[in-house]
């Protein structure tokens, strides 16, 4: 992919968070003439809403300051990675409205990492250790007690080089040896207590096959990957703050910009020599109530079939949110509203829902749909009567145009819009009462038909002929207006009424001996058969509508077709969870 400036799908007002202030100062001082960022996900799962914040920051920052942003897939743990996730990650980034300057993989740099590791050995900064994982834990010490040096720490440079090369040759089994940095076992930062840089894993890699029986550890590969790509500002969440000294140690001790010979393997791949010293900057991660974002827990939800897959519209993966009907514009607006800071906080889920309502209120055409149908027969109209009415597609935006809506003697209305014994303040249909049928006229109910069990199955009534659209009587005041669809023309559809997956604000809270599984909301998905006007059934997959008086819905991207319409409720018209 050619190296073009990262582009944002919107042009937001200038933001003044602390990261942007750092970038402005770096550019103003001449420390950097241009900036480069990267988004470096591991392809071992689907991206979730927390990643949206990082994506918008990494790509948005580059776009805002005329820089570049790479997409780098951190594929250093092949046992857990899958090409399926690689495709999904790229799809998610593009869906959010961003394009990368270059698509890179950590595996592109495996030869560079290896040469860098040999340099550390030659410089006396790394050694091959034979301790087992359990022994390493015992030697590491605790937060209050210093660690102990490995008995293999003082091996000679020649012995370390020999052992490391034999590790690469595949001579030793998994876990037999590691390459460790030689830093300080007494450091107050446990990450600096001679951390592992390489481990032995005889696992086939999706890109390199069986060429490598050893793989770099995250901190080593991540820091050098940034340096290799000339990243100026390496942005990550606060849990990596304690890793920053190790990040800097790796960058400084390897010194790629001062040792261009280490970059020689890249020249054959056509990669430019652009090594630089990156700066790691941490920001608070995105925490939202009523959610879990642990990859382990999300995986369990899928594997235990508590949800219908990674793109279940109740999931907090970007694939799930997209299928639910969340839009890229709403996601970007949400990230802007949340902001960037170093203070951890929990964002109310209603903020996310509010951003979607705001976007769809402006962007979604209106349609009529009935999700719990009750038949209303207008007996003063002739048998078989039908006609075509003109409706505006959007009450606030004439550019959406108009559409034809069929009207007939027999209609479907919402069951909840009729009350035989109305509560106080009721403004909808009652026996003998009048209501305005949206865009069609004023109707009255004269007769209630029930089945043998006493259930209401049909209403019979009258349509005031003087109240039709354009007539003087259409201005006559009545208490309320309801929507409807023609029973003759309406298309039956599956209507999926989604809600929050968890019923409590903190599903991760296990203080009462419960787990997140115990807090699953039994009302998070309800599927009903309803009716939609014909133009709604003709929607393209992922087309969003406001179903009038009902909520915002999207044509399911997997299951919807004109013959078998399927709509997912994206969000209700109002916050039904407000306290």
From Swiss-Prot:
<dbReference type="InterPro" id="IPR014729">
    <property type="entry name" value="Rossmann-like_a/b/a_fold"/>
</dbReference>
<dbReference type="InterPro" id="IPR000924">
    <property type="entry name" value="Glu/Gln-tRNA-synth"/>
</dbReference>
<feature type="binding site">
    <location>
        <position position="218"/>
    </location>
    <ligand>
        <name>L-glutamine</name>
    </ligand>
</feature>
<feature type="binding site">
    <location>
        <begin position="42"/>
        <end position="44"/>
    </location>
    <ligand>
        <name>ATP</name>
    </ligand>
</feature>
<dbReference type="InterPro" id="IPR050132">
    <property type="entry name" value="Gln/Glu-tRNA_Ligase"/>
</dbReference>
<feature type="binding site">
    <location>
        <position position="74"/>
    </location>
    <ligand>
        <name>L-glutamine</name>
    </ligand>
</feature>
<keyword id="KW-0547">Nucleotide-binding</keyword>
<dbReference type="Pfam" id="PF03950">
    <property type="entry name" value="tRNA-synt_1c_C"/>
</dbReference>
<keyword id="KW-0436">Ligase</keyword>
<dbReference type="InterPro" id="IPR049437">
    <property type="entry name" value="tRNA-synt_1c_C2"/>
</dbReference>
<feature type="binding site">
    <location>
        <position position="237"/>
    </location>
    <ligand>
        <name>ATP</name>
    </ligand>
</feature>
<comment type="subunit">
    <text>Monomer.</text>
</comment>
<dbReference type="InterPro" id="IPR022861">
    <property type="entry name" value="Gln_tRNA_ligase_bac"/>
</dbReference>
<dbReference type="GO" id="GO:0005829">
    <property type="term" value="C:cytosol"/>
</dbReference>
<dbReference type="GO" id="GO:0006425">
    <property type="term" value="P:glutaminyl-tRNA aminoacylation"/>
</dbReference>
<dbReference type="InterPro" id="IPR001412">
    <property type="entry name" value="aa-tRNA-synth_I_CS"/>
</dbReference>
<feature type="short sequence motif" description="'KMSKS' region">
    <location>
        <begin position="292"/>
        <end position="296"/>
    </location>
</feature>
<feature type="short sequence motif" description="'HIGH' region">
    <location>
        <begin position="41"/>
        <end position="51"/>
    </location>
</feature>
<dbReference type="InterPro" id="IPR020058">
    <property type="entry name" value="Glu/Gln-tRNA-synth_Ib_cat-dom"/>
</dbReference>
<dbReference type="InterPro" id="IPR020056">
    <property type="entry name" value="Rbsml_bL25/Gln-tRNA_synth_N"/>
</dbReference>
<dbReference type="InterPro" id="IPR020061">
    <property type="entry name" value="Glu_tRNA_lig_a-bdl"/>
</dbReference>
<dbReference type="InterPro" id="IPR011035">
    <property type="entry name" value="Ribosomal_bL25/Gln-tRNA_synth"/>
</dbReference>
<keyword id="KW-0963">Cytoplasm</keyword>
<dbReference type="InterPro" id="IPR020059">
    <property type="entry name" value="Glu/Gln-tRNA-synth_Ib_codon-bd"/>
</dbReference>
<feature type="binding site">
    <location>
        <begin position="285"/>
        <end position="286"/>
    </location>
    <ligand>
        <name>ATP</name>
    </ligand>
</feature>
<keyword id="KW-0030">Aminoacyl-tRNA synthetase</keyword>
<comment type="similarity">
    <text>Belongs to the class-I aminoacyl-tRNA synthetase family.</text>
</comment>
<keyword id="KW-0648">Protein biosynthesis</keyword>
<dbReference type="GO" id="GO:0005524">
    <property type="term" value="F:ATP binding"/>
</dbReference>
<dbReference type="GO" id="GO:0004819">
    <property type="term" value="F:glutamine-tRNA ligase activity"/>
</dbReference>
<feature type="binding site">
    <location>
        <begin position="293"/>
        <end position="295"/>
    </location>
    <ligand>
        <name>ATP</name>
    </ligand>
</feature>
<keyword id="KW-0067">ATP-binding</keyword>
<protein>
    <recommendedName>
        <fullName>Glutamine--tRNA ligase</fullName>
        <ecNumber>6.1.1.18</ecNumber>
    </recommendedName>
</protein>
<feature type="binding site">
    <location>
        <begin position="48"/>
        <end position="54"/>
    </location>
    <ligand>
        <name>ATP</name>
    </ligand>
</feature>
<dbReference type="Pfam" id="PF00749">
    <property type="entry name" value="tRNA-synt_1c"/>
</dbReference>
<dbReference type="Pfam" id="PF20974">
    <property type="entry name" value="tRNA-synt_1c_C2"/>
</dbReference>
<dbReference type="GO" id="GO:0006424">
    <property type="term" value="P:glutamyl-tRNA aminoacylation"/>
</dbReference>
